[in-house]
UniProtKB/Swiss-Prot annotation:
General function of this protein: Subunit of STT3A-containing oligosaccharyl transferase (OST-A) complex that catalyzes the initial transfer of a defined glycan (Glc(3)Man(9)GlcNAc(2) in eukaryotes) from the lipid carrier dolichol-pyrophosphate to an asparagine residue within an Asn-X-Ser/Thr consensus motif in nascent polypeptide chains, the first step in protein N-glycosylation. N-glycosylation occurs cotranslationally and the complex associates with the Sec61 complex at the channel-forming translocon complex that mediates protein translocation across the endoplasmic reticulum (ER).
Protein name: Dolichyl-diphosphooligosaccharide--protein glycosyltransferase subunit KCP2
One GO biological process term: protein N-linked glycosylation via asparagine
Keywords, in A-Z order: Endoplasmic reticulum, Membrane, Phosphoprotein, Transmembrane, Transmembrane helix
Extent of motif Prevents secretion from ER: 133-136
Entry's family note: Belongs to the KRTCAP2 family.
GO molecular function: enzyme activator activity; protein-macromolecule adaptor activity
Lineage: Eukaryota, Metazoa, Chordata, Craniata, Vertebrata
One cellular component term from this protein's GO annotations in UniProt: oligosaccharyltransferase complex
Gene responsible for this protein: Krtcap2
Length: 136
């Protein structure tokens, strides 16, 4: 099921806002045990993915289709937002958020390159059909 760019912008923005609010509401519980701090980093990574999706959809609406997110400023801005939100919970959440975000970014890049990158045809060297001189 594919949604349009505007709908995707609205959904990812709403999910980013709800995830940030949920992280702040349950910050004491997320910081209470080791496993929940790791889960807090995982939630921060989800915030990174949703905010990056919203940011890129906004750019596609403003600048037109085919506009791609670059490392600076889009990815770094969304990563800093997610790391800041995770840092409000616990400092271990920042580390796990960074690790989960980098793994998620790797797979997002891998999937998008297989879907949207055009493959260049393989060039084969042409045979030279000229006459060669015989040397005695």
């Amino acid at each position: 099921m594919v949604v349009g760019t505007g709908t995707s912008l609205a959904l990812s923005s709403l999910l980013s806002l709800l995830l940030f609010a949920g992280m702040q509401i349950y910050s004491r519980q997320l910081a209470s045990t080791e496993w929940l701090t790791i889960q807090g980093g995982l939630l921060g990574s989800g915030l990174f993915v949703f905010s990056l999706t919203a940011f890129n959809n906004l750019e596609n609406l403003v600048f037109g289709k085919g506009f791609q997110a670059k490392i600076f400023p889009e990815i770094l801005l969304c990563l800093l937002l997610a790391l800041f939100a995770s840092g409000l919970i616990h400092r271990v959440c920042v580390t796990t958020c960074f690790i989960f975000s980098m793994v998620g970014l790797y797979y997002i890049n891998k999937i998008s390159s297989t879907l949207y990158q055009a493959t260049a045809p393989a060039l084969t060297p042409a045979k030279v059909t000229g006459k060669s001189k015989k040397r005695n």
